[in-house]
Amino acid sequence: MEFPASVASLSANTVGSNDVLRRSIAYHPNIWGDFFLAHTSEFMEISIAEKEEHERLKEEIKKLLVQTEYDSILKLELIDSIQRLGVGYHFEKEIDRILRYVHQTYPIYDTENKDLRMLALRFRLLRQQGFHVPFDVLSEFIDAEGNLTESIAYDIQGILSLYEASNYGVLGEEILDKALDSCSSRLESLITDTDDDRLSRQVKEALKIPISKTLTRLGARKFISMYKEDDSHNEKLLKFAMLDFNMVQRLHQNELSHLTRWWKELDFANKLPFARDRLVECYFWIMGVYYEPRHEIARKILTKVIYMASVLDDIYDVYGTLDELTLFTSFVRRWDISGIDELPTYMRIYLRALFDVYVEMEEEMGKIGKSYAIEYAKEEMKRLAEVYFQEAQWFFSKYKPTMQEYMKVALLSSGYMMMTINSLAVIKDPITKKEFDWVVSEPPILKSSSIITRLMDDLAGYGSEEKHSAVHLYMNEKGVSEEEAFQELRKQVKNSWKNINKECLKLRPASVPILTTVVNFTRVIIVLYTDEDAYGNSKTKTKDMIKSILVDPV
């Protein structure tokens, strides 16, 4: 996948060939090493007592869901807390049944209930679940210009709830756009005057990344702390969420231990020293998409896939010569190692490792009757290599593409088409050939995700890369300033999110695994590429995030 990097500089580098002038980038080394392998003994096994307590508490929460009155603020708050605590996957059927009922009884106008917090929460929960409910019931709190009415001017909880709800707007809902802006500015003003530290932290987190764009696992880690400080919290739910978090964390730690062993055997750090060495960061990426225990096999395989994609990007973008890349691409295209000795040593090492990952994928999927999906996965990896090669040809020939030419290639080189197809190929959920063909056709939701990925990547990497980017090309083509280009591209990111919201409402419930995959991958991009490239430089923000959910228990 394409990840922003610092400016490439030419240097004599001799991995695989002698005295060849190549580009090189001073990436920082792997910061985790064999941490998860060396600390395996510290990652305790889940005891029988913990499993029994976990099951007992889960049943208690189910009873709570059933016993609480339908469509009451307590029921809605309970569902919201369950989901934000990261344990919603245990109660999917119960929550869907409840929200289906709430949707069926959802009024176009609610003349009796004037509680903004409840109305906005209900609106958000239903849209999250894929129900296209109107925003009319929220309109009495917003004037025609999108400003908040005086009646709620100091209702921080209500405005925060409306802010979160407004993030689920779609194109054409201009009133929600205006409400979002009004809520943001009002919340920033109100938290300077509140003495409620917990509420202030909650608002600051929401303004940074709203619920709609938050990774479930990362959000759960933060929300557990906030929920604990809430005097009205449910003790059983809190205990269950903390136990579940720690149990799932141990599973993730053990998975990383096995993956670290694979990584050490590859020894790319020594054999391919020009490439970024980011195994744990790749696992974090995939875990952001699939954190639930049932996706154990998918996490293992997809971490290897994204790791290999990252190295592939560096082969094309940093190290390979044009002649080497031409020959290398032909081998990827054929998906055959016959005659591989024609390639430089570093390419032979890489290609054998790549093909081994797909052999493992085929073996694992054969066990669950999804062998048919592997060809789709391979074809997308081939296509990724082809677009990387196209970009390399542009670089070596000094060709400057038009914005249209660039985006056609760059949406694919963002890697999210490849990762989506590969992910759907290895998850346990049954994905039909018809659904694969639909995804391969690049439907609007996937195109919107790729636009966000590409533009966030280019915005984060602006000024630190010598290759083409949407920022440079837009400035040159439109004759605008850097600030204007950033403003326009951020607007495109915002509109693409609205398209994703729209498609989620349009396509549910038939394509839930596909929608979940696309949305979660897009959320990872928001977390890693807002304001900086936190993958290329994973020593600060990313390290802290990984530590919070993969090292430190709650």
Curated annotation (Swiss-Prot):
Motif position, DDXXD motif: 313-317
EC number of the protein: 4.2.3.57, 4.2.3.104
GO molecular function: magnesium ion binding; protein homodimerization activity; terpene synthase activity
InterPro entries given in the database record: Isoprenoid_synthase_dom_sf (IPR008949), Terpene_cyclase-like_1_C (IPR034741), Terpene_cyclase_plant_C1 (IPR044814), Terpene_synth_N (IPR001906), Terpene_synth_N_sf (IPR036965), Terpene_synthase-like (IPR050148), Terpene_synthase_metal-bd (IPR005630), Terpenoid_cyclase/PrenylTrfase (IPR008930)
Top-level EC class: lyase
Residues the record lists as binding Mn(2+) 2: 313, 317
Function: Involved in the biosynthesis of phenolic sesquiterpenes natural products. Sesquiterpene synthase converting (2E,6E)-farnesyl diphosphate (FPP) to (E)-beta-caryophyllene and alpha-humulene.
Quaternary organization: Homodimer.
The protein's name in its UniProt record: (E)-beta-caryophyllene synthase
